[in-house]
């Protein structure tokens, strides 16, 4: 939304002159960051506040692959930040794709909510600006998060929705994009036994 001499919901004053003057450059940056999400994260990361954190090279490659390709598969050992990278990649796809409905399917039902909340809290700790991409719910003032016993959902200001569910849930069947966090433990993945 463009307001003359007014503040928009992300805390930035945006005028018609600014859109006319800088719109082309902003569009180019958004296109670049949509393909290089790791560069966007570097641009918004506060190195003074969070000196000990930097994406590892394989995380940057994975984020770029998630942003560009329809099908991506990684095989990685324990401790390689697979879940963190998947949740971060999903969040960024929703940021750069207005109206996207994305679903992340986790293997274990009991830990879906706890893991999702933990990973998104970690993401917001490293990149606090990302939390401003979420809607504020009118009913309780929470920052764009809906939780239930079997799903965790983030609602974005650009009308994207990111839902984290367990493999046993019927939610997420009509999404634009589905990510399987752990395909090894899921029966009949890709039409054959795992």
Show where each model-derived region lies.
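Phosphate/NTP-binding elements of NTP-utilizing enzymes
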Residues: 1-194
């Amino acid at each position: 939304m463009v307001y003359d001499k007014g503040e928009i919901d992300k805390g930035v004053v945006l005028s018609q002159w600014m859109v006319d003057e800088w719109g082309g450059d902003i569009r180019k940056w958004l296109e670049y960051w949509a393909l290089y999400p790791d560069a966007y994260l570097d641009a918004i990361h506060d190195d003074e506040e969070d000196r000990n954190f930097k994406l590892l090279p394989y995380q940057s490659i994975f984020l770029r692959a998630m942003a560009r390709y329809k099908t991506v598969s990684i095989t990685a050992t324990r401790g390689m930040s697979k879940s963190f990278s998947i949740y971060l990649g999903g969040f960024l796809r929703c940021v750069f794709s207005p109206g996207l409905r994305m679903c992340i399917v986790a293997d274990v039902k009991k830990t879906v909510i706890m893991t999702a909340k933990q990973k998104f809290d970690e993401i917001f700790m490293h990149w606090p600006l990302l939390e401003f991409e979420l809607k504020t719910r009118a009913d309780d003032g929470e920052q764009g998060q809906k939780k239930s016993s079997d799903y965790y959902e983030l609602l974005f200001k650009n009308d994207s929705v990111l839902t984290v569910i367990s493999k046993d849930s019927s939610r997420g069947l009509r999404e634009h994009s589905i990510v399987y966090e752990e395909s090894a433990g899921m029966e009949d993945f890709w039409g054959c036994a795992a």
